[in-house]
Amino acid sequence: GLVGALFAGGLSVAEVIAYPTWSWDCVWYHLTQSRLIVQEGTIHYWFGPADGSGPLIYANGYPRLVETFTAFHLLVLRSEALVSAGQLGWGLVGAGVVVAWGRRLGIPRPTALLLGAGFLLVPAVFLQLHTTHADVATGSQTLALAYLVFAPKVSRAVFVAAVAVAGGLVA
């Protein structure tokens, strides 16, 4: 399990480095938003004219979190070398949350680690980890939200911090 997860992660990193974004929806939906963020100089590009004549209005109905990470890569590197890396970190978050769920449910640490590694081997995760899709990020965030919501006791400070982070990601 752990060797497979390392292989999956390594292969995804290699694909991010070696190949450009190529799938149709990555290029026409997700990468378009990232480029608009850079072109317009703001993440609020979707607030165009009321008549809908803003740039590429069709891109306005899609998630923006991974696209914002991709725009960050474009701005910092001034290249498209890592535009497909926007979900790699979210894959690790998802694996970590699976480990945390396992520990909360009383599963021994080594088994919980294997389950977390197994998260990276789920076909929907493995096949999209190196793309600009938003599915791995959304799945990881959903697992993390459920972990917090169903916590036996959550301190007020942790709850307020989680709401602040979620609000910052949505804004």
PLM region spans:
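Start-transfer (signal-anchor) and selected internal transmembrane alpha helices
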Residues: G1-S12
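Transmembrane-helix signature of polytopic, membrane-embedded enzymes
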Residues: A81-L82, V98-L121, S140
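Extracytoplasmic catalytic/substrate-binding loops of multi-pass membrane glycan-assembly enzymes
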Residues: Y19-Q33, Q39-F69, R78-A81
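Short acidic/glycine- and proline-prone juxtamembrane loop motifs at membrane-interface regions
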Residues: L127-A137
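Transmembrane helix irregularities
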Residues: I17, V76, L105, L121, ...
